[in-house]
Each structure stands twice: as structure tokens, then as C-alpha cells.
């Protein structure tokens, strides 16, 4: 029938890998980030800061790849959910992608503000987005911290929606993304 959305069972394997990789990296990044306000200035703290910077660079790389893959390979559509739900899900996913990407760039700038280098996997140095003491970079750090709460709220909505589909609607929405 014209205009009918074909039924697709699962996401492709790379989409699933990227989804769960980004989730794991962001969860680890959040855990390390939560420890950072409570640290002092000793060698052990510098290791924690280095981990946060390295994880941030890894998150940035993973979300950039996921975003490029998503653009090249749109989400498989399904008739299992209403059109309005598909639209809300699509909008939420794009906001999550862009929010995570923005947080990594803002964190990068905030790191430069403190005069610390940003290295991908602790090896490949990335260019500075700002100079040490740059007022914009300080603001970037404040926004970076604020966006953590926005990200947590959106992830909570994402998880609740997935659980709703699995346990209440009893459709395949959640299972399509499971490994």
C-alpha cells in the first residue's frame, strides 16, 4: 500500500555497537566527572583528570562516528509505534547526538582554559580550541557542567520510553537495539 512503512526487525550491527559504546563511554565519563568536584591537587587527582579528558576525547570520536553513520544510514522505520511517537523519538535522538557532541566540544574548550592538553586516547594531541584563561572557555566549562543535567534528563526519558515499549506496549522497540 502506498505510504506504508515497511516492518524492520532490528537495527544494523554497527548502529547497535555504536549505541552501546557511546552509552558505556558516557556512563564512565559521568562516573569520573562526578568524582572531579571532590578532588584536590595531587598526583592521583591528575590521573583522574587525565582519565576524564581521555574519556571525553573517546566520547567525542564515538559520537561523531555514530552521528555520521546515522546520517548515512537512517533509522529503520516500523509500524509498531504511532507516527507522533516516531517523530518524538527521532527528535529526541537528534538532540541526544548533538548534546553529547556539544558537551565534548565544550569540555575540550574548558580543558584548554585550564592550560591542559587534550589528547585522543592519551596519545594524539588535539589542537587547542581556546587559550589558557580565555573567558569564553571558562563559560564553556560552566555550560558543559550544566548540560550534564540536561543529558541525564534526556537519557532518563529515553530509558523510560524504551521500558514502556518493552513492558507495557510489548512491542519490539527495545529489542531492536539489544545486542
Where do the model's predicted regions map?
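Membrane-embedded alpha-helical bundles that constitute the cytochrome b-like, heme-associated redox core
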Residues: 1-179
